[in-house]
A protein has these predicted regions:
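His/Glu-rich zincin catalytic helix
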Residues: 1-60, 168-243
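Charge-rich, well-structured scaffold segments of protease-associated domains
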Residues: 5-7, 55, 61-210, 243
Length: 243
């Protein structure tokens, strides 16, 4: 795993981000350990990010970090997922929690089903967001096969197919240290910080390269234009260029 430490002498805040190269476009791949070819529903990377905070004892790691006075968050993009926090105090307590929850996923039939309702509501909110709809429709006009045209959160239909087994399969494939990067910035002694990070990491075998499979995309656009009616005070438009 790549660990990048950026010392900032006398900096008040400390910042850490831990990311994995697993995003919404990674929906077809070959597992490196088994050679199994896997297709997953749209929205799994985002769904997995949401579920990482829940603990077996019923607590939530975001709440735990907030109780320490730490500003924590996570996000998913087309090509990666990241977990992060910033703080002025309690950095090492926050580091304990971050490394613990990212290394110990907890997925059950019950908590996965519950999350489907929560993410379904989130998808509905984005369906009503003019700016997001503008962007997604532009992607749909430009691309025919590339999964970048699909919403990062997936659809209500696609997330209904997500199971604990799917989540664990993706976690075990993409959350391997060989596929992850950590960046830390603040007033640290790099050698000491690196030692503290390594003490907390679970040693895993390097599983080898993950073979991602992407559909062949033609140079031609999918459609020239698309118009959608929504309640707005001013019209919105977006011009896309397919490279």
């Amino acid at each position: 795993m790549d660990i990048i430490i950026i010392p900032k002498k006398n900096a008040i805040k400390k910042y850490i981000i831990w990311g994995t190269h697993f995003g919404s476009i990674d929906n077809h791949f070959i597992m490196p350990n088994t050679g199994e070819e896997v297709y997953i529903p749209d929205g799994v990377a985002h769904f997995l990010e949401h579920k990482m905070f829940e603990q077996p004892d019923g607590t939530n790691s975001l709440d735990t970090l907030m109780a320490l006075g730490i500003d924590a968050n996570a996000y998913t993009t087309n090509d990666h997922t990241a977990y992060l926090f910033e703080c002025t105090d309690n950095f090492y307590e926050g580091l304990d929690e971050l490394i613990d929850y990212v290394q110990h996923p907890y997925f059950t039939e019950e908590n996965v089903e519950k999350e489907k309702g929560i993410i379904g509501q989130e998808i509905g909110m984005y369906d009503d967001d003019p700016g997001w709809q503008l962007y997604m429709n532009a992607m749909d006009c430009m691309y025919k096969e590339n999964p970048i045209k699909i919403d990062i959160a997936g659809t209500v239909e696609s997330i209904s197919k997500i199971t604990p087994d799917v989540l664990y399969k993706c976690y075990n494939t993409f959350y391997n240290p060989a596929n992850m990067t950590m960046v830390v910035c603040g007033d640290f002694e790099p050698e000491k910080l690196l030692e503290e990070i390594k003490k907390r990491l679970i040693k895993k075998e390097n599983q080898g390269e993950i073979k991602r499979i992407y559909a062949k995309e033609e140079k031609e656009i999918n459609q020239k234009e698309k118009e959608v009616s929504m309640e707005l005070s001013n019209p919105l438009f977006l011009i896309g260029y397919k490279d």
